[in-house]
């Protein structure tokens, strides 16, 4: 018995100490990270849920007026920064409200026990669930047993408000039918849904759009394997590792920070600008390291179809080669919001492609995507499709792969100084006039030389034929080996060295038939040779008539 007295004494001492400790430090008594089915949070109790590492805190809050909200904010940051609001569009109108678990759902009740917000889970109801705030800022509902499945029954990360935290996914979950996007606050003092959204569009290639009233304000460009084609600076974020996933189950973007002790977030502000922040502990303030849209060229379709935006030119809008302003007067006066039209209509079979380098490629919502083929096959595919107006690679890694072809009008492209993507635009062959002139000169020269050779050959053949005919016509008339023309004068036959037939000479001497001469000279017998002269051999002959 004596040995038990000190133990009882220490137990009493511990409980007395714990009682006074909780009385003196009431905040510590409510710093829990879970909410069980038997517990609740009320506005009046000032109770909150704090993540295990003390990074985030969840509780009721108000900014101005009598509207109360349930939200999550950074616990250790001096500037109160909200990252999630549960009942943003259904605030409590007075300081009487409660958060609890009911039928395996998280619910917020007002002073009349009316549900103003709920997780709305349906299906089989678990006997015991618990809500927990994690150190990454995710508020989850899960089974109360630790050995149960790691899959959450519900999580706040699936229902973002205006902020994307590290490890939080933005995009579509096909398996559960979720589309996760951020929506701005209505004002700096009103967390209800504002007019601007930043969400994923999966038609064509997946890419993010900034919307207002369902009108596009800006666009990230599609994922090109390394970054979004309209956010080249992503590769300069050394402290942030980002990932884009596209498969049958989900299409989503997420990021994480390399320094787990630092705080980073992406937030869409009240005027629709998406901003990236990191917390600077020494200055005790948020540092904005990135934002979008950052200039005029980031505004969606600012230059209209068939035109590109370039911040280094004046005006910033430029019609693509082969196109011209629909209203040159408006463009000359500085109004470049009009359209560009083709100078020469396409002919399908003879069209060619003009290469635009370092571009943010057009919106792909109406494009055809084939990731199985390369750039050469993509060009052939575009050529055979007469309505194809441009093509490009879908992935720029390892020299490029995949194919995007645009049908009809395309818009929202811009030119970068470097690191952009190649875009091949279809133009009529006539738009390549300068190149065709050089080519035409070469072809013309080849044809000219060929014609000259053929003509020279024809002339040569004609000349050879004429020479042959001339020789045949001018050949001396003789008998066997003695082919020559004979001239007979007073019974004397002389062989002329040369006399063309057909030449008319004014001869007074009588002409004698050749047969007669042969007979008269006894077949040119040597016995009848009189001698040789300048005109050849001279024969004597005797005619029949004496």
Curated annotation (Swiss-Prot):
<feature type="transmembrane region" description="Helical">
    <location>
        <begin position="442"/>
        <end position="462"/>
    </location>
</feature>
<feature type="disulfide bond">
    <location>
        <begin position="378"/>
        <end position="403"/>
    </location>
</feature>
<keyword id="KW-1133">Transmembrane helix</keyword>
<feature type="glycosylation site" description="N-linked (GlcNAc...) asparagine">
    <location>
        <position position="46"/>
    </location>
</feature>
<feature type="glycosylation site" description="N-linked (GlcNAc...) asparagine">
    <location>
        <position position="387"/>
    </location>
</feature>
<dbReference type="InterPro" id="IPR001480">
    <property type="entry name" value="Bulb-type_lectin_dom"/>
</dbReference>
<keyword id="KW-0325">Glycoprotein</keyword>
<dbReference type="Pfam" id="PF12398">
    <property type="entry name" value="DUF3660"/>
</dbReference>
<feature type="disulfide bond">
    <location>
        <begin position="303"/>
        <end position="317"/>
    </location>
</feature>
<dbReference type="GO" id="GO:0005524">
    <property type="term" value="F:ATP binding"/>
</dbReference>
<feature type="binding site">
    <location>
        <begin position="530"/>
        <end position="538"/>
    </location>
    <ligand>
        <name>ATP</name>
    </ligand>
</feature>
<feature type="domain" description="Protein kinase">
    <location>
        <begin position="524"/>
        <end position="546"/>
    </location>
</feature>
<dbReference type="InterPro" id="IPR003609">
    <property type="entry name" value="Pan_app"/>
</dbReference>
<dbReference type="InterPro" id="IPR036426">
    <property type="entry name" value="Bulb-type_lectin_dom_sf"/>
</dbReference>
<keyword id="KW-1003">Cell membrane</keyword>
<keyword id="KW-0472">Membrane</keyword>
<keyword id="KW-0067">ATP-binding</keyword>
<feature type="topological domain" description="Extracellular">
    <location>
        <begin position="32"/>
        <end position="441"/>
    </location>
</feature>
<dbReference type="Pfam" id="PF00954">
    <property type="entry name" value="S_locus_glycop"/>
</dbReference>
<keyword id="KW-0430">Lectin</keyword>
<feature type="disulfide bond">
    <location>
        <begin position="297"/>
        <end position="309"/>
    </location>
</feature>
<comment type="function">
    <text>Truncated and inactivated form of SRK, the female specificity determinant of self-incompatibility when active. Most A.thaliana cultivars contain such an inactive form and thus, are self-fertiles.</text>
</comment>
<dbReference type="GO" id="GO:0030246">
    <property type="term" value="F:carbohydrate binding"/>
</dbReference>
<feature type="glycosylation site" description="N-linked (GlcNAc...) asparagine">
    <location>
        <position position="147"/>
    </location>
</feature>
<feature type="domain" description="EGF-like; atypical">
    <location>
        <begin position="293"/>
        <end position="329"/>
    </location>
</feature>
<keyword id="KW-0812">Transmembrane</keyword>
<feature type="glycosylation site" description="N-linked (GlcNAc...) asparagine">
    <location>
        <position position="243"/>
    </location>
</feature>
<feature type="topological domain" description="Cytoplasmic">
    <location>
        <begin position="463"/>
        <end position="546"/>
    </location>
</feature>
<protein>
    <recommendedName>
        <fullName>Putative inactive G-type lectin S-receptor-like serine/threonine-protein kinase SRK</fullName>
    </recommendedName>
</protein>
<comment type="similarity">
    <text>Belongs to the protein kinase superfamily. Ser/Thr protein kinase family.</text>
</comment>
<keyword id="KW-1015">Disulfide bond</keyword>
<feature type="signal peptide">
    <location>
        <begin position="1"/>
        <end position="31"/>
    </location>
</feature>
<dbReference type="GO" id="GO:0048544">
    <property type="term" value="P:recognition of pollen"/>
</dbReference>
<dbReference type="GO" id="GO:0046777">
    <property type="term" value="P:protein autophosphorylation"/>
</dbReference>
<dbReference type="GO" id="GO:0042742">
    <property type="term" value="P:defense response to bacterium"/>
</dbReference>
<feature type="glycosylation site" description="N-linked (GlcNAc...) asparagine">
    <location>
        <position position="120"/>
    </location>
</feature>
<dbReference type="InterPro" id="IPR011009">
    <property type="entry name" value="Kinase-like_dom_sf"/>
</dbReference>
<dbReference type="GO" id="GO:0005516">
    <property type="term" value="F:calmodulin binding"/>
</dbReference>
<dbReference type="InterPro" id="IPR000858">
    <property type="entry name" value="S_locus_glycoprot_dom"/>
</dbReference>
<dbReference type="InterPro" id="IPR022126">
    <property type="entry name" value="S-locus_recpt_kinase"/>
</dbReference>
<keyword id="KW-0547">Nucleotide-binding</keyword>
<dbReference type="Pfam" id="PF08276">
    <property type="entry name" value="PAN_2"/>
</dbReference>
């Amino acid at each position: 018995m004596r040995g038990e007295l000190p133990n009882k004494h220490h137990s009493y001492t511990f409980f007395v100490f714990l009682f006074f400790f909780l009385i003196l430090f009431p905040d510590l008594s409510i710093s829990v990270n879970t909410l069980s089915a038997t517990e609740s949070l009320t506005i009046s109790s000032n109770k909150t849920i704090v993540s295990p590492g003390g990074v985030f805190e969840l509780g009721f809050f108000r900014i101005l007026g009598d509207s109360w909200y349930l939200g999550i904010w950074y616990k250790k940051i001096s500037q109160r920064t909200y990252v999630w609001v549960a009942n943003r569009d259904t605030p409590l109108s007075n300081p009487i409200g409660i958060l609890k678990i009911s039928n395996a759902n998280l619910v917020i009740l007002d002073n009349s026990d009316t549900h103003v917000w709920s997780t709305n889970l349906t299906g089989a109801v678990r006997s015991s669930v618990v809500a927990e705030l994690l150190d990454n800022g995710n508020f989850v509902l899960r089974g109360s047993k630790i050995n149960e499945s790691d899959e959450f029954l519900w999580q706040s990360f699936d229902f973002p408000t205006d902020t994307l935290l590290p490890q939080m996914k933005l995009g579509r979950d096909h398996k559960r039918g979720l589309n996760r996007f951020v929506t701005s606050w209505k004002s700096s003092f009103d967390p209800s849904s504002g007019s601007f959204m930043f969400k994923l569009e999966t038609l064509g290639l997946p890419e993010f759009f900034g919307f207002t009233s369902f009108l596009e304000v800006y666009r990230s460009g599609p994922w090109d394997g390394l970054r979004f084609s309209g956010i080249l600076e992503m590769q300069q974020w050394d402290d942030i590792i980002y990932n884009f996933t596209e498969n049958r189950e989900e299409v989503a973007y997420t990021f994480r920070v390399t320094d787990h002790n630092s705080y980073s977030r992406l937030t869409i502000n009240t005027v629709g600008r998406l901003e990236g922040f990191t917390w600077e502990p020494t200055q005790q303030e948020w540092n904005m390291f990135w934002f979008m849209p950052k200039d005029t060229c980031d505004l969606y379709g600012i230059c209209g179809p068939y035109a590109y935006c370039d911040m280094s030119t004046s005006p910033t809008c430029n019609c693509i080669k082969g196109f011209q302003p629909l209203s040159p007067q408006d463009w000359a006066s500085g109004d470049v919001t009009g359209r560009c039209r083709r100078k020469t209509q396409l002919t399908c079979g003879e069209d060619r492609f003009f290469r635009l380098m370092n571009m943010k490629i057009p919106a792909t919502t109406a494009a055809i995507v084939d990731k199985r083929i390369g750039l050469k096959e993509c060009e052939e595919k575009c050529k055979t499709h007469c309505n194809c107006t441009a093509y490009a690679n879908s992935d720029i890694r390892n020299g490029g792969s995949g194919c995007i072809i645009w049908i009809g009008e395309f818009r929202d492209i811009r030119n970068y100084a470097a690191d952009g993507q190649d875009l091949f635009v279809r133009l009529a062959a006539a738009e390549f006039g300068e190149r065709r002139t050089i080519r035409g000169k070469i072809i013309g020269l080849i044809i000219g030389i060929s014609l000259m050779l053929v003509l020279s050959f024809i002339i040569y053949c004609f000349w050879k034929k004429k020479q042959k005919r001339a020789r045949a016509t001018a050949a001396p008339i003789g008998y066997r080996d003695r082919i020559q023309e004979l001239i007979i004068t007073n019974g004397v036959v002389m062989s002329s060295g040369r006399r063309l037939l057909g030449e008319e000479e004014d001869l007074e001497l009588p002409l004698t038939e050749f047969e007669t001469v042969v007979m008269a000279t006894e077949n040119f017998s040597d016995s009848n040779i009189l001698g040789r002269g300048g005109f050849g051999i001279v024969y004597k002959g005797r005619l029949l008539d004496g």
